[in-house]
From Swiss-Prot:
Binding-site residues for (2R,3E)-phycocyanobilin, renumbered to this chain: C187
PTM: Contains one covalently linked bilin chromophore. This protein autochromophorylates (Potential).
Organism: Porphyra purpurea (Red seaweed)
Record EC number: 4.-.-.-
Annotated GO biological process: photosynthesis
Compartments it resides in: Plastid, Chloroplast thylakoid membrane
Lineage of origin: Eukaryota, Rhodophyta, Bangiophyceae, Bangiales, Bangiaceae
GO molecular function ontology, one term from the record: lyase activity
Name recorded for this polypeptide: Phycobiliprotein ApcE
An example Gene Ontology CC term for this record: chloroplast thylakoid membrane
Length: 886
């Protein structure tokens, strides 16, 4: 088996401990149900005690030094033990009021004790002294050991506060069980037990007046001491039946820390609700959902048999696996390899372990079909050992039992909820990679990137048609590159031929000199410098530059034309330009960007991880410009291109060469279909019968909209407008309101005050429009001669620049006009939100050519094109009676 191949390494985060809330919620989530009343009561009890738990943890934290000092004085003599407690790891004493200070002083006492005091305190503590305990002399014990011992005592107290806050002693059980054997090898576990008991006694004395706090501290200290005294747990072994399968062991702390997978066992003594829960667990395991709840499907006959004890859970699982529902969901949509992997997930709770096991069950599946595979799995010895006759299969995932390293990635993916959405088999692909030779591919990633156009794709997203493969290359693997030209000129075997041209077999080489050198080309160029610049753009940017971009690059190109810089320096400046950065640096992650830049400037992909890591380190520590300098100032660049040669492609990948060539195997052999001469009926009906002129076509394109829409002039004024602009706006207002230009001769003295106020900037345009519409002349011309409907039309035309929208608007304005008169009608239009949003306070109203609603455009068109004095008919009755316009 290849040592390079692996199943990938998805991130695994085993749960380190449990809390009361996590345990309750996770158990309900695993069973796909809501929280029950008892679980809700547990959460309520935990949340209600939260303030007390935080208070207890805070008091223990404030008195941490005292607790550790008292515990240390109990087991150490001949010196001040607390002085060896390292301050950064010790809890901080935060003294409160005077009473708390007195209590701390009372508890702390004199920590300088002698052997007699320590020995006498053993008999006053209460409880039997552990056998083998002897007080430890500080001087003989040594500084290093004293620091470690005090650190351990402080660690016990800290984890006690963690457990109190979390509401579950699980964090203590996971981390303390097994420490007794470890401490026995270093010093004395009996001394640790004495210290913990003394710490408990002192902590209980702190909460002497708080019964609830005292009970809480006693409960968790008892867990600390009992877990420390208990022997360490043995590892969970996973025995295998075949020599090709791995035997594994798992420390039980992993399974204790996480929330264990619930086991559902069918017993005749269970209640009806409990039996229903077991049946639902079978559905969730086999069909990955509760089909009775999700799809309203149930196998009532089988359910009644298993509940009545006529068939076992094993036979019930067998019936589910051979049912039409399972066949349509997990067998027919997949190839046999993937169907086999999903069957292992559903019936054994794991994935295939080896190629031999896969071949064995694949042969059964191919020969006997789905029913034969299900029977073979359920009749296996492994199924009998783990699940027996009455236990529902469950996922044997990380934390539940030890996992194999050779199928680590596919195993974790298989137990994910999204496993049925992956159609491509994973395990057989992985097992075949173990036995095959290494393919030619990029040293990064999962076999993804042999093409010369996809460098650095080390993290491909598998959103569509996922094909996860293992990363089989290490950091010392060198990539295979093909030389453009004779193979004897390869720089790996012969570095001295780097500057040697490949001749007619290689790419064109452009060199800046008095005459342009173009290998295998007889083209005549007008100016060699212009050609060098153009070729450099194509090489560096991968395309011709745009006109605006060329303006930015013109100073650099001028320096090249004047001979102030060489081609090498010209390439450097192009690579440092903002154009190049926006193409190959800013939108890409660093690894892929370095691949692109390296290929553009040096003419070849990177050889492997070591080379790209060098540039990655430079980019991280020194920045982008130093990466460009490192490539252009490298010995390989100088030896190959020198000062005046434009970089060219020297090496590429084998797949890149195959991509550029047309081979019979990659040419699409599909032929074009013969198009029938008979056209469809809808095409014939859609053909134009008459001959249309260009003017007719243009009018149809315009769809009735004239050029006036684009030629409209909008008059705006502001505080800085000149007198001439104000006069123009005033004349435009006259034409808009009265539909004609009024001069001083015709208006007489009626508008002199209005005109004077506007020209002196005492009123704005909006107020001007309102005063003009409220004038006697407007009432005489557009109100008195017409009915209300026509007045509404003219009012919206003059003030809002459009015809009425619908009958509902006409009805609303008619009520205002009929009940309150013209002045209120004008004020309603001028002060409307539509007027403010379209014209504001400084814009003269104008024709707006509205297109919504659709009927409003022809009405407005008719209203503006009709001569008002010659035609008094109403326009808006063209509205049809449609629901919403009424």
């Amino acid at each position: 088996m290849s040592i390079k191949a692996s199943g990938g390494s998805p991130l695994a985060r085993p749960q380190l401990y449990r809390t009361a809330s996590i345990l309750t919620i996770t158990q309900a989530e695993q069973q796909d149900r809501f929280l029950q009343l008892g679980e809700l009561n547990q959460l309520v009890s935990f949340l209600n005690s939260g303030q007390k738990r935080l208070e207890v943890a805070d008091i223990l934290t404030k008195n941490a030094n005292i607790l550790v000092a008292r515990a240390a004085d109990k087991i150490f003599v001949g010196g001040s033990a607390i002085s060896y407690l390292e301050r950064p790891q010790a809890a901080v004493i935060i003294a409160g009021d005077q009473s708390s200070r007195d209590k701390i002083n009372e508890l702390s006492g004199n920590i300088q004790g002698d052997f007699g005091q320590s020995f006498r305190s053993l008999f006053n503590a209460g409880g039997a002294t552990p056998p083998g305990f002897k007080p430890i002399n500080v001087l003989r014990y040594g500084t290093t050991r004293m620091r470690k011992s005090l650190r351990d005592l402080d660690w016990f107290l800290r984890y006690l506060t963690y457990a109190i806050v979390s509401g579950d002693p699980n964090i203590l059980s996971v981390n303390i069980r097994g420490l007794r054997e470890l401490i026995d090898n270093a010093c004395s576990s009996a001394a640790a037990i004495v210290a913990l008991r003394e710490m408990r006694r002192t902590a209980l004395a702190i909460f002497e007046e708080d019964i609830k706090g005292q009970d809480l501290v006693r409960e968790y200290f008892n867990v600390v001491i009992s877990e420390f005294e208990a022997p360490s747990l043995t590892d969970k072994l996973r025995k295998r039946e075949s020599t090709d399968l791995q035997g594994l062991r798992l420390p039980q702390t992993y399974s204790q820390a996480g929330v264990s997978t619930p086991r559902f066992v069918m017993k005749s003594s269970l209640s009806a609700d409990e039996k229903n829960t077991v049946v639902k667990a079978c559905y969730r395991q086999i069909f990955e959902r509760d089909i009775a709840k999700t799809y309203d499907l149930s196998l009532s006959n089988l359910e009644s048999q298993v509940k009545n004890g006529q068939i076992s859970i094993k036979e019930f699982i067998r019936s589910l696996g051979t049912s039409n529902i399972y066949r349509k969901q997990f067998y027919e949509p997949f190839v046999n390899s993937r169907a086999l992997e999903l069957a292992f997930r559903h019936f054994l709770g794991r994935g295939p372990s080896s190629l031999e096991e896969f071949q064995k069950y694949f042969a059964i599946l191919s020969a006997t079909g789905l029913s034969g595979l299900v029977n073979a799995i359920l009749n296996s010895a492994e199924y009998a050992d783990y699940f027996g006759e009455e236990t529902v299969p469950y996922f044997r995932k990380l934390g539940e039992e030890p996992q194999e390293c050779r199928n680590w990635g596919p195993q974790i993916d298989l137990l994910n909820y999204s496993a049925p959405f992956r159609k491509v088999p994973q395990f057989i692909t992985l097992f075949s990679d173990y036995k095959q030779s290494l393919p030619d591919q990029h040293p990064y990633g999962t076999g993804n990137d042999p093409l010369s156009i996809q460098f650095g794709a080390i993290f491909p997203k598998e959103n569509k048609d996922p094909r996860k493969r293992q990363a089989i290359f290490g950091k010392d693997t060198r990539r295979i590159l093909v030389r453009r030209g004779p193979g004897i000129y390869n720089q790996i075997s012969n570095p001295q031929v780097r500057p040697k041209s490949a001749g007619s077999l290689g790419p064109k080489i452009f060199k800046l000199s008095n005459t342009l050198v173009a290998t295998n080309s007889s083209a005549n160029f007008e100016n060699s410098v212009d050609v060098i610049a153009k070729v450099s753009y194509l090489r560096v940017f991968g395309r011709e530059v745009y006109q605006e971009e060329k303006l930015l690059l013109r100073p650099i190109e001028s320096q090249l034309q004047d001979g102030q810089i060489s081609v090498r320096e010209f390439i450097r400046q192009l690579a440092k330009s903002s154009i190049f950065r926006s193409l190959y640096w800013e939108p890409l992650y660093i690894c892929k960007a370095i691949e692109y830049i390296h290929n553009r400037l040096l003419g070849r992909p990177t050889y492997g991880r070591q080379e790209i890591n060098k540039y990655f380190d430079i980019a991280y520590k020194e920045g982008y410009y130093q990466v460009v300098d490192a490539i252009i100032d490298s010995p390989e660049y100088i030896e190959t291109f020198g000062e005046n040669v434009v970089p060219y492609e020297r090496y590429t990948t084998p797949a890149g060469i195959a991509l550029r060539s047309l081979r019979p195997g990659i040419i699409d052999q599909r032929f074009k279909k013969v198009i029938s001469s008979k056209s469809s009926r809808f095409v014939e009906l859609g053909k134009v019968k008459e001959i249309r002129s260009s003017n007719d076509i243009q009018s149809r394109i315009a769809q009735g909209v004239t050029a006036l829409r684009d030629q409209s002039v909008i008059f705006d004024v502001n505080q800085n407008s000149s007198q001439e602009v104000l006069e123009q706006a005033l004349r435009a207002a006259y034409r808009q309101i009265f539909e004609r230009d009024l001069n001083s001769f015709s208006i007489g003295g009626e508008f002199l005050d209005i005109e004077s106020s506007f020209l002196n900037k005492q009123i704005n345009v909006k107020e001007l429009i309102q005063k003009l519409a409220l004038s006697e002349l407007y009432g005489k011309e557009f109100y008195q001669p017409y009915p209300n409907t026509k007045v509404i039309e003219l009012g919206t035309k003059h003030i809002l620049g459009r015809a009425p929208n619908n009958q509902a608007e006409i009805r609303f304005l008619n009520q205002i006009l009929a009940s309150k008169g013209l002045s209120t009608f004008v004020e309603t239009l001028v002060n409307s939100s539509e007027y403010d949003s379209v014209y504001g306070t400084n814009t003269v109203p104008y024709r707006r050519f509205p297109t919504l609603p659709a009927a409003n455009f022809p009405n407005t068109e008719t209203l503006y094109n009709r001569l008002t004095k010659q035609n008094v008919s109403v326009v808006v009755p063209s509205f049809k009676k449609v629901l919403g316009n009424q």
